[in-house]
Amino acid sequence: MYNRLFNRCPRYYHACPIAPDIVFHLASIVSGEAESNFDAGWQVNMFTMWHYLEALKALHIGSNGAYVPKIIFTSSIAVFGGPFPEQIDDTFLSVPQTSYGAQKASCELLLSDFSRKGFVDGISLRLPTICVRPGKANLAASSFFSGIIREPLNGQKAILPVDESVRHWHASPRAAAGFLRHAATLDSGLLENRRALNLPGVSCTVAEQIEALRRAAGQSVIKLIERQPDDTIIN
């Protein structure tokens, strides 16, 4: 699928094997990896979006305009950069401070423009950091937010690379699934051409996370969290 659609070859714009009514676009190289591997980050996170939208545009044109799929794109709060106000709303300026954030912001603009032209009907959801994520840790810079909960609960050590005063914005996997389902049924005409939306979440500090874990599982679990500052993540 990747080779057929995303190798920058124009003849593959017509190679989309199916014509879905709704597309949930979740795929990406995660933040830490996108920062360390610049070329791969842009190729996977931005150029694949462009080529997939081109493939859907070809289906739209081939249907004489009848085919207009709904695209739900999982963007990120990484599109924002400081300094931050007390509250961030949908009108806050997008000034990403990472390659990952820049790639997500680029995809938001691509999706908005393809939607403006009527090729697709897209909405970008700026998801909070999903916590607690299941499975193993990945290369996302925010992975530790889940790790300091998930690993200790499984009797494993977890690395905390930032100060406990760090505040972040979280949503659960269940909440994220609900956001996606709701967006799929949303009348985009209500958005007045503002197709990138901030989503609700829980704002808390790392210290508050750890205290919640302590109340739920006890002090012995907290001892499995090791403080190891990491300038790459801190900055």
Region annotations inferred by a language model:
Residues 6-44:
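NAD(P)H-binding glycine-rich loop region in Rossmannoid oxidoreductase-like domains
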Residues 22, 36, 40-51, 94, ...:
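Glycine-rich NAD(P)-binding loop of the Rossmann-fold in SDR/ketoreductase-type enzymes
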Residues 23-29, 71-77, 125-128:
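SDR active-site strand-loop-helix element
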Residues 48, 52-56, 110-111, 179:
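Hydrophobic positions on the long internal alpha-helix
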Residues 50-97:
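Conserved Rossmann-fold NAD(P)-dependent oxidoreductase catalytic core, especially the SDR/UDP-sugar
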Residues 82-84, 95-123:
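Active-site Tyr-X1-5-Lys
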Residues 112-167, 173, 177:
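NAD(P)-dependent short-chain dehydrogenase/reductase
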Residues 161-163, 169-235:
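C-terminal substrate-binding subdomain of Rossmann-fold SDR/epimerase-dehydratase oxidoreductases
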